[in-house]
A protein has these predicted regions:
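Bacterial N-terminal signal peptides
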Residues: 9-19
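Solvent-exposed loop/turn segments at secondary-structure junctions
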Residues: 60-63, 75-76, 94-97, 119-121, ...
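Ligand-binding loop in jelly-roll beta-barrel domains
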Residues: 116-140
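A short, N-terminal "cap"/entry segment at the start of jelly-roll beta-barrel domains
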Residues: 21-65
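Conserved short histidine dyad/triad with adjacent acidic residue
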Residues: 62-82, 115-117
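Bacterial N-terminal signal peptides that target proteins for export
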Residues: 1-10
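Short acidic-glycine-tyrosine-enriched beta hairpin
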Residues: 100-117
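Glycine- and acidic-residue-biased ligand/ion/polar-headgroup-sensing regions
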Residues: 72-75, 82-100
């Protein structure tokens, strides 16, 4: 019995030591990341020439990510949802947002959180469009709502 308790203690200590080492190894791989929105490389979003994106970190096709995104002037995304939460900070222009509670004009320096599964409409200002930083807790998707 004493030997079993002792062995369980040893195994637990090894698991903890390995976990701490693994976490520290992950943290040491993190590096400072600086990207200028004006210098970023934007590409048109697949299937939509009115939206362009510049990946900052992660992969929006498969995982949590951060991107600079641009809506062309007057862009209308229509009613839709996303599976995962989306956090937005507008840099330039205006991100137009509407849901059942009303409409919002989200301007430079403003923050907007859209919960996953929340039905909403979004678009770009008619004159300036919108440039914003967008971050999500998972892959990006666009689910049209009728």
């Amino acid at each position: 019995m004493k030997r079993s308790v002792f062995l369980v203690g040893i195994v637990a200590a090894l698991v903890v030591a390995w976990s701490v080492g693994w976490v520290q190894g992950q943290e040491s791989k993190e590096k400072l990341l600086f990207v200028s929105a004006s210098q970023a490389k934007y590409t048109a979003m697949s299937g939509n020439s009115s939206v362009s994106v510049a990946p900052i970190w992660g992969n929006s096709d498969t995982e949590a990510h951060g991107t600079f995104s641009k809506f062309a002037p007057g862009y209308d995304a229509g009613m839709h949802t996303h599976t995962n939460d989306v956090w937005i900070v507008v840099i330039k222009g205006a991100y137009l947002y509407k849901d059942d509670a009303g409409a919002k004009r989200v301007g430079p320096g403003d923050f907007l959180r859209v919960p996953g599964g929340h039905k909403h409409w979004s678009g770009g200002d008619k004159k300036d469009g919108a440039l914003f930083y967008e971050e999500s807790s998972g892959k990006f998707d666009f689910i049209p709502v009728k």
